Amino acid sequence: MTLPLLGPMTLSGFAHSWFFLFLFVVAGLVALYILMQLARQRRMLRFANMELLESVAPKRPSRWRHVPAILLVLSLLLFTIAMAGPTHDVRIPRNRAVVMLVIDVSQSMRATDVEPSRMVAAQEAAKQFADELTPGINLGLIAYAGTATVLVSPTTNREATKNALDKLQFADRTATGEAIFTALQAIATVGAVIGGGDTPPPARIVLFSDGKETMPTNPDNPKGAYTAARTAKDQGVPISTISFGTPYGFVEIDDQRQPVPVDDETMKKVAQLSGGNSYNAATLAELRAVYSSLQQQIGYETIKGDASVGWLRLGALALALAALAALLINRRLPT
């Protein structure tokens, strides 16, 4: 929860929870205050002549006299929470991640069930994805059909990726497994260069396709898509799959209409085996929404941030109010 002027305020993820032991001190102060009030009442009752007491103190003490003490205790509680170091989730841009954009350029991408065509829609959405991706992420591009080709090695230069997207060419057949293996190799290569730590940079493959694998026909083949997805899982590289198109797509080949329905099941299985997520889109707007969602997932990481400042500010406010109330009500600072 974030409050105006105070900032993020949470009651979880305490970095120094042992500071809560200070609550025993606060409890002791409360007990001492209660004992002092009881002793004060006993001293007043020692007056044998109640008429004399009423003439000396004609007005009974107001209950408002406890407000400064209550505010003081509240400030101590708030300061204790602040010292315990509450934290909250903070999203920060990644600057070491690698993303491989893998796009199917098989003949089925000519289908016009998605206006103006599957290929053109894919190019437009992918370029938007490149523009919106966090600048520090290294983005690479692979086009695949019967073979896979690295068009752009992972780089922070988005223009290189967008220029390559404009030059995609159709080809025959679909070798999804080879495309995934090629992406893993590209990730390993760039990871060795930009490592900068004890662990390789986080990486992800974004696989865009509209049809099932044809080379090989069995995805569990050593070079098949499922085998490649399992390898990606072993290497800690999740695959986000996007199946694009409708069940009614077709292309004209040698003056014959060939149905090219989208294959959601294969893409879902690839994502599942790799530990990633699967998406489907039947329009350009849906595809852009998918890429936007991926950009938010890939472009940022969540870390724990300090959330104690808000509690400190509230504590300071309560302490100031305690002093003000003491001066206005009791004509002295709270003791």
UniProtKB/Swiss-Prot annotation:
Gene3D superfamilies per UniProt: von Willebrand factor, type A domain
Compartments in which it is found: Cell membrane
Family: Belongs to the UPF0353 family.
Topology versus the membrane: Multi-pass membrane protein
Alphabetic keyword roster: Cell membrane, Membrane, Transmembrane, Transmembrane helix
Record-annotated disulphide pairs: none
Domain VWFA: 98-294
Signal peptide location: none
Superkingdom classification of source: Bacteria
Family annotation (CDD domains): vWFA
Family annotation (InterPro entries): Aerotolerance_reg_N, UPF0353, UPF0353/GerABKA_families, VWF_A, vWFA_dom_sf
Protein name: UPF0353 protein BCG_1543
Transmembrane portions of the chain: 18-38, 67-87, 309-329
PANTHER family from the UniProt entry: LEUCINE ZIPPER PROTEIN 4, SPORE GERMINATION PROTEIN
GO cellular component annotations of the record: plasma membrane
